[in-house]
Every structure is written in C-alpha cells, then in structure tokens.
C-alpha cells in the first residue's frame, strides 16, 4: 500500500510527506513473514533433516551458548560444567568422559526447532498496579511482583532473579514466602551467575512453580520439563545481557570516584525518583549515594550501546517469539508517554498464562491493547554485533583499562554520530516543512 510513495515526476512532494499508517503496513508485513516462515519450515520437514553429527555434543556445534545450564543438567556423566568466559557463563565439555550421547544437544535452546509461538499471536495487555509501594520498588508497572504474590498465596514456589549485594552479581533463587518477593523486584541488567544450579531445585520442588527468566533461559529449561501443568513460565522482554566485566569495571569506577567499597552495595538499575521514563541508576552503601541518568552513567552507556552483550544475544531466537506462558516488560511507546510510575506490557501466550493473569487483574489497571504496540515499540530484531566486539571484550577483561577509557574509545564516537544524524534529520524536516508552507503561500 506504499506504491504511491515511490518517487517519480508525477509525484507531488506533499503526498510523500504525508504520515504513513504503520499499523496497516506492519500487519501486512506480519502476515507475509508468517507465510515465509511456514514455507521454510515445510521445506525443511520435507527434506527429512540431516544425520546426527558424529560428535554429538554442544561444544562441537557452531552455535552460541546463553549459559542456561540445561545441557549440564541432563549430562549423564557430568562431562559439562559452566565456565566463566570473558564475563559470561558458557558450557564447557570434558571430551575425555563425554559419551556423545546427544542429550545436551537435545535440550540446547540454540539447536534444533523451537516450540515457540509468535508474539503477534499472543494477547497484549497493559498493567499498572494499584499499590504505590509496589510501583516504587518495581521497574515498571508491578506485574512481576503481583504474579509472584499471587503464586505464593496460591501455594506456589517462585523462581526469579535477585541482585547479590556482596558479590555484585545477579543470582537466580527459589522463594517460598511473601516476605522474600521484594528480593526479586527491579531490573538486574546482568546475566544470572547460577541459573544452571536452580534447575535441580525446580525438579525436586514439592509444589507448583512460577519461573521467571530471560527468553533463552526459559527455552532451555522448558526443553527439560516441557509443558508440565505444575510449572508456569514467565519470560522477560530482553535486549541482551552485558558481560559481568562491565559491572566489575563499573564498581572500580564507583570506588575510585566516590569511595564505594565492595561490601553490601545495593544498586537500583531503574530508580524512579524522577519518573519511570527518566531511567536513573542509583547506588547505595552505608550512607553513600550515587545517582545518575542513563545518558551520563558509564554502566548504562555501555549497556545501551549494545557492544558488550553475550555472543548469544546477537543471535537471539526470541525477539518476536516466546516459549513462555506470559511475557512481561516495559510498555514503551506513545500510549503511556508521560506516566510517572510505570506501566507493564504483558503478552499472554497460553491458556495457563491467561488463567494466571485473570487471577491478578483486579490488583491493578489491566486493559486489552493492540499487539501492534509490541511490534512497533519493542526490539523485534537482533542488534548487530560490532566489528570491534573482540577488542572491547578484551579491554573489559584488561584490569589496566578504565571504564571511562572504554567508553571514550568505543561508545562516544557512536553517540556523536547518532547525535549528528538526529540534528540533520531535524534540519531536513524543518526545511521540508518551510518548502511546503512557502509553496502553499505562493499558490494562494
């Protein structure tokens, strides 16, 4: 429906400048993508697949590792462990005892077909909790807290991520009481350091489980447990996880500049003191307080650049898909622009998810929305891996290089380029508007 915007001598400039109805465009693109996907899947199935590799283990496949630990859990001879590689958890296989049985390959979320669903086939809701105290401690609208709360009072255990104040790491924990829910509140912006260790606790749990995780973690653990009735999966809208080395560099910066010490440090990655959309990061420690907006804070600048994510993040399979029952995140876009305390985007992907949301909807303002809001305002395609990726990861591992030097070398040039392009677009739009106005005056 955009053929009239192809430029030729008979096209009037004011027609080209008219606003495009992107909702209509995106709906057409979504239908065409689905057709293409079905065609490719049918072609693959018709071909019958390939023979199993002789070396049938995850380390012999040219696929990224997200550190979920599913392979480690199913290995019958404990040949796999999760090593730290450049600040990321990564599977390592002991070839001396590996049986090449293929069990690790079968559960790897990056190998084989996924039983995931398209986000566009889900039901989109907005959610904002009625309890102001819940909103203030939550990164957005409080939906994660409310899901966990409802789970606890219904007799479930909750698996989620907390920030370890002593080790400055994100950790996945299992909680059993309402008093522990606040440990899970707030964004972490780090890869969980022990997700692989929680799988055994899920297996041994004597109650139903509500399990929060990144899309790749959920995909991995679901390959182990499947659609068991006693597990509800909730994945998070995820842009990527930075290297733990970013946090190490960041704390060295806080220590050097502001006198922080590595002991009992609380970090609010999304402090709402100036509002939900402002995105401040605040650090607290025994009377010391550091607080800065994202465009000036070194941790945020590195995270937002997208230059130091895990290799797996650049090949994510779940930007517009999910293996979970519910997906949650911030409701970005124009619909709630100006909201001070936060609103959640909630995508219901299954009947189990719908039943859970139905139980909690009266705790807040829960409204049906158009799924196109997700496709228009969330990151539905992978970010490009920078050509200097190996270099920046190496510099992050180098103790003699500061976080300021890394930002100056890699991030600042791109920030300047983006700022220049933004200015040029504004000037161009202003000139075009003046030309249209001038033409209209002459015609009169």
Describe each PLM feature range:
Residues 168-196:
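Glycine-rich phosphate-binding "P-loop"
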Residues 241-251:
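Short, charged, surface-exposed secondary-structure boundary motifs
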Residues 138-142, 165, 211-221, 240-242:
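Gly/Ser/Thr-rich loops at beta-strand to alpha-helix junctions
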Residues 226-237:
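A short alpha->loop->secondary-structure connector
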Residues 2, 6-9, 16-74, 78-81:
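Ferredoxin-type iron-sulfur electron-transfer modules and their immediate structural context
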Residues 154-157, 255-444:
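Long, compositionally biased charged/polar accessory segments in the mid-to-C-terminal portions
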Residues 103-144, 148-150, 410:
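Electropositive, gly/pro-rich neighborhoods at or near active sites that engage anionic ligands
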Residues 44, 61-66, 70-92, 102-120, ...:
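Iron-sulfur cluster-binding cysteine motifs and their immediate structural context
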């Amino acid at each position: 429906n955009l053929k009239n915007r192809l430029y030729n001598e008979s096209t009037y400039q004011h027609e080209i400048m008219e606003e495009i109805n992107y909702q209509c465009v995106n709906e057409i693109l979504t239908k065409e993508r689905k057709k293409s996907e079905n065609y490719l899947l049918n072609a693959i199935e018709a071909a019958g697949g390939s023979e199993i590799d002789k070396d049938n283990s995850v380390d012999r496949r040219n696929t990224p590792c997200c550190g979920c630990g599913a392979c480690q859990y199913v290995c019958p001879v404990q040949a796999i462990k999760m090593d730290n590689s450049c600040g990321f958890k990564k599977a390592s296989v002991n070839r001396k005892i590996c049986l090449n049985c293929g069990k690790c390959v079968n559960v790897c979320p990056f190998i084989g077909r996924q039983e995931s669903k398209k986000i566009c086939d889900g039901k989109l809701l907005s959610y904002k909790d009625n309890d102001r105290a819940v909103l203030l401690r939550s990164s957005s609208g409080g939906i994660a807290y409310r899901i966990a709360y409802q789970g606890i009072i219904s007799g479930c255990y909750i698996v989620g991520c907390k920030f370890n104040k002593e080790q400055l790491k994100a950790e996945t924990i299992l909680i059993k009481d309402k008093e522990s829910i606040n440990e899970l509140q707030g964004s972490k912006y780090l890869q969980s350091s022990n997700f692989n260790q929680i799988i055994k606790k899920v297996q041994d749990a004597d109650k139903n489980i509500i399990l929060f995780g990144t899309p790749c973690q959920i995909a991995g653990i679901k390959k182990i447990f499947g659609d068991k009735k006693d597990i509800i999966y909730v994945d998070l809208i995820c842009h990527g996880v930075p290297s733990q080395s970013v946090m190490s560099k960041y704390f060295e910066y806080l220590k050097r500049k502001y006198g922080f010490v590595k002991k009992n440090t609380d970090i609010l990655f999304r402090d709402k003191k100036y509002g939900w959309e402002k995105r401040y990061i605040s650090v607290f420690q025994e009377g010391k307080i550091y607080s800065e907006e994202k465009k000036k804070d070194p941790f945020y600048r590195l995270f937002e650049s997208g230059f130091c994510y895990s290799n797996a993040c650049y090949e994510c399979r779940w930007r517009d898909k999910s293996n979970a029952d519910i997906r949650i995140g911030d409701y970005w876009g124009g619909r709630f622009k100006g909201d001070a305390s936060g609103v959640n985007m909630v995508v219901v992907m299954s009947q189990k998810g719908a039943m859970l949301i139905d139980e909690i909807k009266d705790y807040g303002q829960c409204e049906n929305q158009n799924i196109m809001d997700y496709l228009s305002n969330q990151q539905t395609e992978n970010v490009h891996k920078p050509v200097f990726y190996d270099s920046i990861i190496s510099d992050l591992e180098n103790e003699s290089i500061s976080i300021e030097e890394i930002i100056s070398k890699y991030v600042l040039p791109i920030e300047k380029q983006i700022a220049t392009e933004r200015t040029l677009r504004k000037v161009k739009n202003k000139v075009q508007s003046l030309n249209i106005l001038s033409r209209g005056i002459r015609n009169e």
